[in-house]
C-alpha cells in the first residue's frame, strides 16, 4: 500500500459523507460526533434496541463500543450488528476494557461470536483478552506490555477472519495476510479521553467508503495520526485542553497532501 492510496481515503470520506451509526459509550458521545463531523462524515448516535436494526441497515458503517456497557446495551449492539451483517454494512468493534472484569470480557466475546465484525480496534490488552489470552489491563487502559503486538494482531485476525488494529505508540494493522505499522500520532492523544474511541469511529467512516477494510484502517490511522501531530505542534506548550480543540480543527483541515508528506506507513512480514 503506497502513500497515494493512504491519502485517498479522506478525499473519499469528504466526497461521500457516509452515515456512521455509533453505538458508543456515554463518556465520548459528543466528542465522537464532533470528530466525525469535522472530518466530513455524518454521525448518528442511536442506542435503543427498538430502532437499532433499522438504523444499522441504512448506515455506511456500524461502530460498536462497550465503554459504558450494560446487558441491555450489549443486546442492542448484537441486534444492530446482525442487521448490519444482513445488509452488507461493515461493523467495527471496540472492546473497551476487555479483561478488566468478567462481564466486560464475556460481553466482548459474545459480540464477536454473534456478529460478523469487519474490524476490531483496541489496545493489546483488549484484543488479547477478547481473544481469551491473559494480558495485563488497568481499568480500560493497557498495562505493561509483555508480548509481541504484531503476532497478537495476526493471530486474532486469522482466528476471527477480520482486520485487527492494535493501537499504541505505533499502530499495528493486519488482516492476517498483510500487516502494516503506522507511526503517526502524538502522546497528547493519551491525555484526552475518547481519542481511541473516536479513532474507532473514524475507521468506520473510512470503511464505509473503501471495501478493503485493512486498506481503510491504514488510511484512517495515517490521517488520524497526522491530525494529532499537527494539532500538537500548535498547542503542545498549552496542554491537553487546547490540544483537544485544535485536534478537531485539524481533523477538518488535514488534506491528502499532508498525509503524503507526513505519513509513516510500513509493511511488515
Curated annotation (Swiss-Prot):
What GO cellular component entries does it have?
cytosol
Q: Binding positions for substrate?
A: 45, 194
Q: Does the keyword ATP-binding apply?
A: yes
Sorted UniProt keywords: ATP-binding, Kinase, Magnesium, Metal-binding, Nucleotide-binding, Thiamine biosynthesis, Transferase
Its EC number(s): 2.7.1.50
InterPro entries, alphabetically? Hyethyz_kinase, Ribokinase-like
Q: Which family does it belong to?
A: Belongs to the Thz kinase family.
Question: NCBIfam families given for it?
Answer: PRK09355.1, thiM
Protein known as: Hydroxyethylthiazole kinase
Species name for this entry? Bacillus licheniformis (strain ATCC 14580 / DSM 13 / JCM 2505 / CCUG 7422 / NBRC 12200 / NCIMB 9375 / NCTC 10341 / NRRL NRS-1264 / Gibson 46)
Amino acid at each position: 500500500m503506497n502513500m497515494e492510496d493512504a491519502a485517498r481515503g479522506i478525499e473519499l470520506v469528504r466526497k461521500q459523507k457516509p452515515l456512521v451509526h455509533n453505538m458508543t459509550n456515554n463518556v465520548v458521545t459528543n466528542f465522537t460526533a464532533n470528530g466525525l463531523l469535522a472530518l466530513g462524515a455524518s454521525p448518528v448516535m442511536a442506542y435503543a434496541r427498538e430502532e437499532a436494526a433499522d438504523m444499522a441497515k441504512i448506515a455506511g458503517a456500524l461502530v460498536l463500543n462497550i465503554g459504558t456497557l450494560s446487558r441491555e446495551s450489549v443486546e442492542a449492539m448484537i441486534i444492530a450488528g446482525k442487521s448490519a451483517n444482513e445488509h452488507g454494512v461493515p461493523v467495527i468493534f471496540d472492546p473497551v476494557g476487555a479483561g478488566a472484569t468478567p462481564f466486560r470480557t464475556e460481553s466482548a466475546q459474545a459480540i464477536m461470536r454473534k456478529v460478523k465484525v469487519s474490524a476490531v480496534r483496541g489496545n493489546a490488552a483488549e484484543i488479547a483478552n477478547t481473544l481469551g489470552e491473559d494480558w495485563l489491563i488497568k481499568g480500560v487502559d493497557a498495562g505493561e506490555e509483555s508480548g509481541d503486538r504484531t503476532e497478537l494482531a495476526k493471530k486474532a485476525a486469522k482466528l476471527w477472519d477480520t482486520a485487527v488494529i492494535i493501537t499504541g505508540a505505533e499502530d499495528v494493522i493486519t488482516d492476517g495476510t498483510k500487516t502494516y505499522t503506522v507511526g503517526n500520532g502524538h502522546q497528547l492523544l493519551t491525555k484526552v479521553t475518547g481519542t481511541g474511541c473516536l479513532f474507532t469511529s473514524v475507521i468506520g467512516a473510512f470503511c464505509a467508503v473503501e471495501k478493503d477494510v485493512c486498506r481503510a484502517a491504514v488510511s484512517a490511522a495515517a490521517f488520524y495520526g497526522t491530525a494529532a501531530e499537527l494539532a500538537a505542534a500548535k498547542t503542545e506548550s498549552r496542554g491537553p485542553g487546547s490540544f483537544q480543540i485544535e485536534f478537531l480543527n485539524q481533523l477538518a483541515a488535514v488534506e491528502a497532501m499532508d498525509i503524503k508528506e507526513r505519513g509513516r506507513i510500513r509493511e511488515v512480514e
